[in-house]
Curated annotation (Swiss-Prot):
Name the record gives this protein: Transcription factor jumonji domain-containing protein
Amino acid sequence: IEMAEGGNDNIGNESIK
């Protein structure tokens, strides 16, 4: 799981999926 700033959005930084 890639945790990055951005939350659940798929755009921008790698969000948690």
